[in-house]
Amino acid sequence: GDCFFKQVFNLIVEYIDSQPKYFVHRDYHSRNLMYPMESGMPGILDFQDAVHGPVSYDLVSLLKDAYIEWDEDVILDQAARYWEEARKVGLISNLDFSDFYKQFEFTGVQRHLKILGIFSRLSIRDKKNQYLENIPLIEKYLLSTTERYKELHPLRKILDKALLK
């Protein structure tokens, strides 16, 4: 029970903590991006909570967005492109793509658990029920990732019970 839960969370923290750190928006998703401005650059909103964080965090926020679902092949392709560019500019070194993608996925688990909590709080405390419609996509991300990695299976079992699936 609790022991497995703690082990899984410690593992998730290890994967997040092992990543190179740089500027992270922390809320980099579709609803915080504006169509390209006159300059041709997109407008980026809600950046006041930016921090120094794991290199894959904003990528997870964008590719496993709470509001838009991308096909898995698109996610893999874009993650690979990001990894290649990050290596070229020196953000990532000595890390093959499969290791980077695992870090990306574990970072996603942390982010998606946080989002489930935030959306639930917004509904229960603030009566903002519109976020509930996005929970199934977040659950889908969590269930597929926790199924894919053996180390996350204990969390998957907890999620199965909690989500009544």
Where in the sequence are the language-model features?
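ATP-dependent phospho-/nucleotidyl transfer catalytic cores
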Residues: G1-R26, M34-E38, P42-L45, E133
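Hydrophobic packing residues in well-ordered alpha-helices of helical domains and bundles
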Residues: D2-F5, I75, V109, Y131-I135, ...
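Activation segment
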Residues: P36, P42, A50-H52, I68
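Amphipathic, non-membrane alpha-helical segments in soluble helical-bundle scaffolds
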Residues: D49, E72, K102-V109, K128, ...
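Histidine/acidic-rich helix-loop-helix segments that form or flank divalent-metal centers
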Residues: S93-K102
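ATP/Mg2+ or Mg2+-diphosphate-binding catalytic cores
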Residues: G117-K165
